[in-house]
Amino acid sequence: AGMVFRNNIDWLANQYNECRMGSSMFSYLLGYQDPRLSAYFEASPSAYAVAAFDGKNYQAVPPGNANQQNTIYTDFSKPNITSNTPTYWMRASEVYFLRAEAALRWGSEFGDAEALYEQGVATSFDENGISSSVDDYLASGLTPIAHNMRASYYSYNAAAPTTATPAFS
């Protein structure tokens, strides 16, 4: 029909400057040393970006944004998406996580919650081209981090959102 596909998140992130990594996501990905970090977000050229375990620098947006022009956060870490990246309604990994939640909530007739959760993590690694060991990730014992976010016009202390580890239990 002559229509050209363009990823809608790319449009929000790169044309409107309305989509950047938030502080909670930053806490989880850095704290867990999650190998999907660079698959999810681009490094930041900001002078205030934080060095991560993958050797790149990232900067997250604090909660709330009153800037109507969306010009403050242009150099912060944005989704690692181009106009040609497929838009997924729901990925297979998310289905495994939903099934794990159903098994926890309504019982084993929905499957083994732990096995479904771990399959969700493994599938997510595969979907994002990550070759790191899922077993090592799940057994890491790491937790989300508290961190300070700064720029020339603010400083924000973000508490760790939880003490949960990547392990199921």
Question: Where are the regions that the model predicts?
Answer:
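Hydrophobic-face positions in mid-chain alpha helices that act as interaction patches
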Residues: 1-99, 105, 110-169
